[in-house]
Amino acid sequence: MMSVTVETLENLERKVVLSLPWSEINAETDKKLKQTQRRAKIDGFRPGKAPLKMIAQMYGASAQNDVINELVQRRFYDVAVAQELKVAGFPRFEGVEEQDDKESFKVAAIFEVFPEVVIGDLSAQEVEKVTASVGDAEVDQTVEILRKQRTRFNHVEREARNGDRVIIDFEGKIDGEPFAGGASKNYAFVLGASQMLPEFEAGVVGMKAGESKDVTVNFPEDYHGKDVAGKTAVFTITLNNVSEATLPEVDADFAKALGIADGDVAKMREEVQKNVSREVERRVNEQTKESVMNALLKAVELKAPVALVNEEAARLANEMKQNFVNQGMADAANLDLPLDMFKEQAERRVSLGLILAKLVDENKLEPTEEQIKAVVANFAESYEDPQEVIDWYYADPSRLQAPTSLAVESNVVDFVLGKAKVNEKALSFDEVMGAQA
């Protein structure tokens, strides 16, 4: 193979000029045309018997284009291997204006290479390790939430109070005119749950079934309905029904409803503590991991390959569209989401992927089979039949990709925590459970 020069363009972009001998192009084109001849069905000739000259006239140009494309791809691969180029993404090929060599056809390949990743001094980085505990008070709080989730509403003949579920008819007008979305029949909501604007709810409190009244409501300037934002409406409200909330007692029936077969309340509390502890642990680990990843990004000066960032942005866009489809938005698959929306997140992911790969390779942080099994077991623990979930993961090796990635990340977090300056941060139960995770 003739030597080629790799030209450095901007940042990670490189360029090589590939020379394809016309003798090779012509030979490969002839071979392709002969293959086409054997398959061709042309009027006036038996299948495969049309003259090669006719085949060349009909298919010669497209055959030559196919050959050039194939040779370019092959030659670029050979050059990348010979030059030990770590190509990121796919190259783009461009014609070369100066075709000064009549013996060959020249094509320029423009591509990006992976950046050199140099891990900085991790001991200079500060990392926040988040901690939280789950005790009796947190179990009590969770049990109370579970009680509220099983609230029963019973009809009462009295005025409406906060906490009641009410059913109303309402019609709103702005400057005496009805507006879109301003009216409804038999609309149910819970007073005090912030489902309606505060002035609207306050107007219903104290009403009895069968009563009607006008309530003035000022829509906030930042209200999601732009047509009514900042305007004042008068709602005519008729109260149809009032129901009082009743919470279940924490007894054997309640425990059975939560899956404790014998109705043992103590067992139920143990199960609640175990489940809540698992969720709290997951959330604090996520926050610690986020701090570790931020520290790694600070420790490494890195320019992510544009091609990989674009690929990741496209993947994130498709992921969002699929989520919309799964939520019932059938037309979401055709949404044209601008990739710029995802560029920042994509660049972060690509950069972290490169950093983690380097860190894992340099420090032998690949997870063991036991670590992967532990992650799978942790996934399975929250299901009714954990062994069925474990068997599902191990039935197809591709399903182990997610547990393996989590095990890798866990090893990286432990490694960085052992190197960096660690500041422990204790969070309350409410702070942990209120965090996005």
UniProtKB/Swiss-Prot annotation:
Its EC number is 5.2.1.8. One of its GO terms (cellular component) is cytoplasm. It catalyses: [protein]-peptidylproline (omega=180) = [protein]-peptidylproline (omega=0). Keywords: Cell cycle, Cell division, Chaperone, Cytoplasm, Isomerase, Rotamase. Gene3D superfamilies: 3.10.50.40, Trigger factor ribosome-binding domain, Trigger factor, C-terminal domain. One of its GO terms (molecular function) is ribosome binding. It comes from the Bacteria. It is found in: Cytoplasm. GO terms for biological process: 'de novo' cotranslational protein folding; cell division; chaperone-mediated protein folding; protein transport; protein unfolding. The keyword Cell division applies. Residues 163-248 form the PPIase FKBP-type domain. InterPro entries: PPIase_dom_sf, PPIase_FKBP_dom, Trig_fac, Trigger_fac_C, Trigger_fac_C_sf, Trigger_fac_ribosome-bd_bac, Trigger_fac_ribosome-bd_sf, Trigger_fact/SurA_dom_sf. The keyword Phosphoprotein does not apply. Consists of 3 domains; the N-terminus binds the ribosome, the middle domain has PPIase activity, while the C-terminus has intrinsic chaperone activity on its own. NCBIfam families: tig. Present in outer membrane vesicle formulations which are used as vaccines in human. Belongs to the FKBP-type PPIase family. Tig subfamily. Involved in protein export. Acts as a chaperone by maintaining the newly synthesized protein in an open conformation. Functions as a peptidyl-prolyl cis-trans isomerase. This is Trigger factor. It comes from Neisseria meningitidis serogroup B (strain ATCC BAA-335 / MC58).
